[in-house]
Amino acid sequence: SADVGSADVGSANPAFGAGPPHWLGDGFFGPTDQPLPLSLTPHFRWSAFYAAERLTPITQGCRDAGVFDATEAALLDRLAATIDRHDTDEAPSRIHGDLWSGNVIWTSAGATLIDPAAHHGHREADLAMLALFGSPHLDVTIAAYQDVRPLAEGWRERVALHQLYPLAVHALLFGGGYAAQTISAARRYA
């Protein structure tokens, strides 16, 4: 089985948003035929990073593309402006960054992770992404993570918060019900 919980234990954790060692420039997020730039600008607080480098740019992109109307975009802008109240003050962890079930290859020997959007982020983000699109063995994965490095109190209440960025990306790239899902999740926190 995958050693999911220990993947980030002991990492250098320079700042939220920082890329992997020796990486220069932005990263990428999304499908290889339509990758979106992924800012790797470092921030010392998760809330500042998530607001400035994830929520604000994707909200603007969705607004410009007509995916979100003015009221919906204003809701996400308000959330970005007040997101610090949801900050848990945890140190950054090295995360996969695009950890949905399609980027986990399960074999009899365990799991292999592919197609990362690696950076230092909030460690709850990868688990939230796995939950978003239905990952096999999710309960076992979370239990293994909890055994190695227990999650902060209230982490389950923050799952949808960490799902906002990938939901909005899906709304921008694929349309469908992702815009409504994004706005529904944002209303829980704004």
PLM-predicted stretches and their roles:
Residues 1-67, 91-92:
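A cross-family kinase active-site recognition segment
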Residues 46-48, 60, 89-94, 101-157, ...:
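Active-site Asp-x-Gly
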Residues 160-168:
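Hydrophobic alpha-helical segments that form the core
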Residues 68-87:
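Short, conserved active-site entrance elements at the starts or edges of catalytic domains
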Residues 4-10, 107-111, 190:
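Conserved NTP-binding catalytic cores of kinases and kinase-like/nucleotidyltransferase enzymes
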Residues 11, 74, 169-172, 177-190:
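Regulatory N- and C-terminal appendages and interdomain linkers associated
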